[in-house]
Amino acid sequence: MDILKEDGYDTEAKFYEIFESYINEGLVWADQDFKSYFHFYNPKNKRGMYGHSTNAMTLANSYYKNALYFISKNDYKNGMAYFGAMCHVIQDLTIPQHAKIKLLDSHKQFESYVKSNYKKVKRFKTNESPLLYKNISDYVNFNSTSALNLDYMYKNIPNQQTKFYLVACNALKLSQRSTAGCMLMFFNDLEKIKQEDKIYEYN
């Protein structure tokens, strides 16, 4: 939301502040009961975890559609929670392991590093403008492709802490900018709901 304010999207920022608790519930829910198993997507072969048709691409689109569905029914609690869950999936895809689909490639260590250092390292935050795309699929493809590029860029760095720092600097900024972009897209889609009286289906 800080990025939205910095870029002058005050109306949008205030809207999301109202429903921040619901969004946070969705962010947490997205990782519960092994749902994170499907937060993987390789943009090269367009697949997630082996043997499963559900992946970060299908899940993010499903959550987004459900968010629109519930809000079209005036159910902001579930609608904003689904939006938060969608944001979680989009954010996960900025991490190389989620795009490479390799659970054992220092995945937990990297996430622990980010949790421990996110508030301490100023370079992990950005005020750059939101990334604007037309749909959720574009965000999934861009974030996962960027994650693969980060992995390639820093793969030969021997020191794990240095590698984590460099990947986190880029991945976290991408996460913030893409989330802000999704917020703007979702806000605009909600405005269309009011104007068009469009019917959405639960996915």
Language model segments and positions:
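N-terminal, motif-rich segments that launch catalysis or mediate targeting to/interaction with membranes
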Residues: 1-73, 78-81, 99-203
